[in-house]
Amino acid sequence: MVSIAGQIGWEAVIGIETHVQLGTASKIFTQASTNFGDDPNTNINPVVCGLPGTLPVLNQKVLEYAVKAAMALNLKVSEHSKFDRKQYFYPDLPKNYQISQYDEPIAEDGWIEVEIAEKEKQTYTKRIGIERLHMEEDAGKLVHIGSDRLTGSNHSLIDYNRAGIALAEIVSKPDLRTGREAAEYASEIRRIMRYLGVSDGNMQEGSLRCDVNISVRKGKNAPFGIKIEIKNMNSFSAIQKACEYEISRQIKAINNGERIIQETRLWDENKQLTTSMRSKEVASDYRYFPDPDLGPIEIELDRREAWKHELPELPAIKRHRYVEELGLSIYDARIITDELPMAEYFESAITAGAEAKALANWLMGDISAYLNTNKTTIGEIKLRPSQLAELIILISNGEISGKIAKEILPELIEKGLSPSALIDDKGLAMISDNNQIRTIIVELLSLYPEEVKAFRNGKIKLQGFFVGQLMKKTSGKADPKISNKILLEILNASEN
């Protein structure tokens, strides 16, 4: 695969439409359930199916979530907006139109900043403009039998459980230039939505779906090229790979004298390429007009201000604070703040007295390894933040070794025990009494007279051997600093 870096003078222009399922218990215009995984066509009713005589009523929790999402993305929330009907005919749309927002969306003109870490390049921050956020209803889902798409299938089934679920569609400006930037942007959008609690952002379940619009041009000042829409990417790595493939495909096509046509393409994860799906529609094809069953949306200033005060500290602000105030590296801050429960656990442990860097190392190292191995989350383990802080303080004070702390960690996580109590119960406290350590070393050296003689004759590497035997004899409990000091005192003393 040829990357854009190998095509001198070419630039990619990328924008992303992110469809976020808002995590309300009921759908956007009806009380039908939004529960994922229920039997097909059980979460439907006459409103979802568009039966004659039914009228939609806006779910106020959807409005709240959409406004909070807009505020977190620095969008300007409109005092007045409306719903429109987007006309198109497809089996997954029972009404033959989708209720969306066209020329008066709920919010416009925002931005977020994303941190881009390219391989072998320094991390940089880039501001990505956001054109708009609008509310709309989701469509149903087609299940193709005999193929993963309509072409080649024996027949198709329709599940309308997803139809009518509330979506916030977030449309970026064409400010992205690489697949990596596109993936980081989408990841930051999901992170923000999760921090807000307005969506779980689960890409595998379709809670967050991204459509990428991409074109290439010869130079930064050249007009935009013909854009291609890419669908069917269910991970951030897929977004990056799809962009990189499509950039190379378009450049190759243009260099070969081929014409790029405006179309929608699908990303094939197995083959690692995009394939043509259909020609791309334009806005006029949908024949938008105001929905006559839904009145205008008016959001009073008091209500907007109340929702604004409920916003949490957002990921970018939290990352910056961890670096500036707690001294974490940019990398550590990114990892700790990636999921809100981990960040909350981290802050609770800091409050309980843990040193920030040591705490970050434990969370990113042994604890994350345990979580991954046992397929659990930080919110599900029994080890409380205060108990992890206690463990770190015990290590810092020299009361236990890091090795012993690692050994008892699984039991602490599984049982939620006090580290001090467990250490006392198992007799694992560090031996730091000088006289006790001296006595143990003298007894130990008496077992290795030849090695002691060799050390005194200049074979100083044997010090490591003696330390190893001492740790073995004390089960790793002898204080290393004190032990080394006393060991050298005895070994360097005269044989008499």
Swiss-Prot record:
It is found in: Plastid, Organellar chromatophore. HAMAP family: GatB. This is Glutamyl-tRNA(Gln) amidotransferase subunit B, organellar chromatophore. Subunit of the heterotrimeric GatCAB amidotransferase (AdT) complex, composed of A, B and C subunits. PANTHER family: GLUTAMYL-TRNA GLN AMIDOTRANSFERASE SUBUNIT B MITOCHONDRIAL AND PROKARYOTIC PET112-RELATED, GLUTAMYL-TRNA(GLN) AMIDOTRANSFERASE SUBUNIT B, MITOCHONDRIAL. GO terms for cellular component: glutamyl-tRNA(Gln) amidotransferase complex; mitochondrion; organellar chromatophore; plastid. SMART domains: GatB_Yqey. Keywords: ATP-binding, Ligase, Nucleotide-binding, Organellar chromatophore, Plastid, Protein biosynthesis. Allows the formation of correctly charged Gln-tRNA(Gln) through the transamidation of misacylated Glu-tRNA(Gln). The reaction takes place in the presence of glutamine and ATP through an activated gamma-phospho-Glu-tRNA(Gln). InterPro entries: Asn/Gln-tRNA_amidoTrfase_suB/E, Asn/Gln-tRNA_Trfase_suB/E_cat, Asn/Gln_amidotransferase, Asn/Gln_tRNA_amidoTrase-B-like, GatB, GatB_C_1, GatB_Yqey_C_2, Gln-tRNA_amidoTrfase_suB_CS. It is an enzyme of class 6 (ligase). Belongs to the GatB/GatE family. GatB subfamily. GO terms for biological process: glutaminyl-tRNAGln biosynthesis via transamidation; mitochondrial translation. GO terms for molecular function: ATP binding; glutaminyl-tRNA synthase (glutamine-hydrolyzing) activity. Gene3D superfamilies: 1.10.10.410, GatB domain, N-terminal subdomain. It catalyses: L-glutamyl-tRNA(Gln) + L-glutamine + ATP + H2O = L-glutaminyl-tRNA(Gln) + L-glutamate + ADP + phosphate + H(+).
